[in-house]
UniProtKB/Swiss-Prot annotation:
GO terms for cellular component: cytoplasm. The active site is at 89 (proton donor/acceptor), 152 (schiff-base intermediate with acetaldehyde), 181 (proton donor/acceptor). It comes from Clostridium tetani (strain Massachusetts / E88). Keywords: Cytoplasm, Lyase, Schiff base. The lineage of its organism: Bacteria, Bacillati, Bacillota, Clostridia, Eubacteriales. InterPro entries: Aldolase_TIM, DeoC, DeoC/FbaB/LacD_aldolase, DeoC_typeI. This is Deoxyribose-phosphate aldolase. It catalyses: 2-deoxy-D-ribose 5-phosphate = D-glyceraldehyde 3-phosphate + acetaldehyde. Belongs to the DeoC/FbaB aldolase family. DeoC type 1 subfamily. HAMAP family: DeoC_type1. It is found in: Cytoplasm.
Length: 216
């Protein structure tokens, strides 16, 4: 298995410097990862660094709380795409989901999906550690309904990360036609493999190199 093709090589910590981001891009080029995932500020830099390679620029939207308005998320998406993003990882409105305001959740995801249509893949972060199983299923169903390309477990900034049980539930909910991304706390090959076996076809991790080296 070419594990590197599953990996979104990620640096989302607020103190990330330009030098660190450039280093990450070089690693992604060398290891042929799926993408480099960064905060919006670094979109242009990453796009420039990855030019002429198959590694995609992936940018987070409404991150990490998901509590921005849909208009702001749509604008963030538009700007990210203009600056070279080929994938966007958005955080849902978690409070609205808890309140069973499913129309709000739907419109929120839809705002990003509509902005990205035909230009970038959309991954929807549902933040599994804050949800009941019922809420996880609902978030996945809504994401699928509005045309998201992936559902994703976690931001890595909340109370917990990816669990294989959640990945399995998400995969069962969305079926085979959309992606499932496991992220948050995945630091070795063994865990990555467990996530893939549970149904993930993308892994978000800052430990991508370690994961690949362990797979050899």
């Amino acid at each position: 298995m070419e594990i590197q093709k599953f990996i979104d090589h990620t640096i989302l910590k607020p103190e990330a410097t330009e030098e660190q981001v450039k280093k990450l891009c070089k690693e992604a080029r060398d290891y042929k990862f799926a993408s480099v995932c960064v905060n919006p500020y670094y979109t242009s830099l990453v796009s420039k660094e990855l030019q002429g390679t198959d590694v995609k620029t992936c940018v987070v939207i409404g991150f990490p709380l998901g509590a921005n308005t849909k208009e702001v998320k749509a604008f963030e998406t538009k700007q990210a795409i203009e600056n070279g993003a080929k994938e966007v990882d958005m955080v849902i409105n978690i409070g609205a989901l808890k309140d069973k305001k499913y129309d709000v959740v739907k419109e929120d995801i839809e705002a990003v999906v509509n902005e990205a249509k035909g230009k970038a893949l959309v991954k929807v972060i549902i933040e599994t550690c804050l949800l009941t199983d019922e809420e996880k299923v609902k978030a996945c169903e809504i994401s699928k309904e509005v045309g998201a390309d992936f559902v994703k477990t976690s931001t890595g900034f909340s109370t917990g990360g990816a669990k294989k049980e959640d990945v399995k539930l998400m995969r069962e909910t969305v079926g085979e036609n959309i992606g499932v991304k496991a992220s948050g706390g995945i630091r070795d090959y063994k865990t990555s493999l467990e996530m893939i076996e549970a149904g993930a076809n993308r892994i978000g991790a800052s430990a991508g190199i370690k994961i690949v080296e362990e797979s050899k």
